[in-house]
Amino acid sequence: RIHQEIRERKAAVDERLAEMSAVVREDDTATEYAYRYIIGFDGDLKRLAAYIEDLEGVEILSLGRALELIKDLGDATTVSGQYGLTGFEGTHAIGHTRMATESDVDIRSAHPYWAYPYSDIAVVHNGQITNYWMMRRELERRGNRFLSDCDSELLAVYTADKLTNGFSLEDSLRQSIEQIDGVFTYLVATADQLGLAKDTMAAKPMVLYESDDIVALASEEVAIRAIIPQEIDTYDPYEEEVRVWQA
C-alpha cells in the first residue's frame, strides 16, 4: 500500500511539472521514498516549488541549478551508498553527520540545510542559536518560509535573504556574527563559493587546511588527515573569523 501511494504521488508530481512547462530530462529513484529529477525550466522556481509542495505527502528537499543536496538518516557510509556519492563530480562540497539535540530525527531535519525556495544555497552548522525565534519571526515577516524548527535552517534562510537583497557572501557572514546570538560555526555553499563563519566566542571547533590545490575543513583534524596522506599544517580559525573561497 505504501509503495502504491508513492507511485501515485510521483505521477501527480510529473503531471504538475508538465503543467508548469518543466521538461523532465531525467528522473530516478534515489531511495524507495525519494526521487531525483533533472528538469529543464526557465520559469519562477518559487512558484514551481509551491505548486509541487501543494500536493499532499510531497516535500521538496532541495531545488537548484548547480548544487545538489543529499539529506537522509544514517551514518556517512550508509547515506553515501544510498545515493552513490562516490560518483559525484564538482568543485566543492559540505556535509555534517550529527546527533540531533533539539530537533526531530527525520530527513527534513538532516543537514545540509536548504533555504526554501532559493536556488543553490546550502548550510551545515554546529552550535546553538539563542535568538532563533526572534530572528525567525523577522525573516518570516520578510516573506521567507521555514520547513523545520531546527535553528540550523535559520542560517540558510538568513544567508539566502541577504544574497537575494544584494549582499555579498562575505558581507552576509560578517553580519550574521553581529545579528545572530549563540555559539556557532557554520559553512555555506553557493554555486561558486564556499564560506566559513565563527561566532564571537569560537566555542565550536573548526580545523582548516589550505593549499594551492585544496581547501579542507572539519570539526576534528583527524578527518582531514584521513584524506590527505602527506604531513600537513592545519589552522584553527579564531573568534569572529570569516573566510570565503571561490570555487
Language-model-derived ranges and their functions:
Residues 1-247:
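Conserved short alpha-helical segments that host acidic/polar catalytic motifs at enzyme active sites
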